[in-house]
């Protein structure tokens, strides 16, 4: 019987949780079903103003096409926009390609994004800053950014970024971390080795190719736990690293809107209004808690 219950829960999770989004709006429970569309899912709103194309990445445990319910940020994005009358076409892409598509106007919204500084240059539009190409929403819940080191290795980060000078640090390609850290990186005050994903970052640290890596600890741990490594390799890798010093920063998350999207300022205002409503009504926390527990068996 327990096996049957487990299988039913497993099938239900993959068949339904990943296809529908449920949220509370104006004291009413709303459910919107996702329909296969192009290379993603389309969530249609009644009397839709228009369809907005969101591009995102696999970034578990926040959001991933491989999570049983795609993660709370996925549900949150659909709910926020649907509550404002927008249909949503949501597509998973490699991060660098997602950034490129939104900056070039091939998609409307990039999320979840960290705060983008005015001085951050675009990698895809020559002589342009990213903020010239993208509008940034108000913030929503994110996570800490920390340095990880090998266990038993001397601590490097003292709380002052100056302590990083001369070190070799692993970073994920295309990510912004903090303005101060990124400025030091651009000035080559420490050596950088880029990784294509969080698992590769962890492996760089384990292999002693870098002194530290920077990232969200929950994302880094998840990248190992749900990788294709065998169980012994996972345990060995996770047990070999630890946080170096206090968190560097708490990074909130944002929606980034292409300024090539028609009436992008109106879309930005609608998103900010929904963020305010969701936060003050408690719907943001409810969604996070509900979706995070949804696939627990």
Regions found by a protein language model. Give the residues of each.
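Bilobed "Venus flytrap"/periplasmic-binding protein-like clamshell domains
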Residues: 57-61, 66-79, 147-187, 193, ...
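Extended ligand-binding regions for polar small-molecule ligands
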Residues: 21-32, 74-82, 151-154, 167-168, ...
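Short helices/loops that flank or line small-molecule/ion binding pockets
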Residues: 96-110, 184, 199-227
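Classical Sec-dependent N-terminal signal peptides that target proteins to the secretory pathway
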Residues: 1-18
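Extracytoplasmic small-molecule ligand-binding "clamshell" domains
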Residues: 21-123, 194, 291
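Periplasmic-binding protein-like
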Residues: 57, 139-145, 231-269, 296
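A ligand-binding cleft/hinge motif common to bilobed small-molecule-binding domains
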Residues: 113-128, 211-249
